[in-house]
Amino acid sequence: MANTTSAKKATRKIARRTDVNKARRSRVRTFVRQVEEAIASGDADKAKAAFLAAQPELARAASKGVLHSNTASRKVSRLAARVKALSVSATA
């Protein structure tokens, strides 16, 4: 239990930031899941649109410190490769 006034304030701030970060992380997961569902359905256009929406969300999460920048880059890279493979197989 926090005893000093500053420790109590820090606890309140941590709780607020935790809620904000949870919301951001959840939003990122939702966007990534939409891309993965579009890939699974085999719809290249829908997958590309979902990927283009997810990319800035991942970058925003990385810039805000919710995700490490390497983690966000890795997710973007892997999703891009899967979307590209889907569009190549759709045109072939």
Swiss-Prot record:
Keyword Ribonucleoprotein: yes
Record key words, sorted: Ribonucleoprotein, Ribosomal protein, RNA-binding, rRNA-binding
Transport recorded as keyword: no
InterPro entries: Ribosomal_bS20, Ribosomal_bS20_sf
Example GO BP: translation
Gene Ontology terms, MF aspect: small ribosomal subunit rRNA binding; structural constituent of ribosome
GO cellular component terms given for this protein: cytosol; small ribosomal subunit
Transmembrane segment boundaries: none
Lineage top rank: taxon: Bacteria
Annotated segments matching region Disordered: 1-23
UniProt cross-references to Pfam families, sorted A to Z: Ribosomal_S20p
The protein's role, per its UniProt record: Binds directly to 16S ribosomal RNA.
Family: Belongs to the bacterial ribosomal protein bS20 family.
This protein's name: Small ribosomal subunit protein bS20
Organism, as annotated: Rhizobium etli (strain CIAT 652)
Gene: rpsT
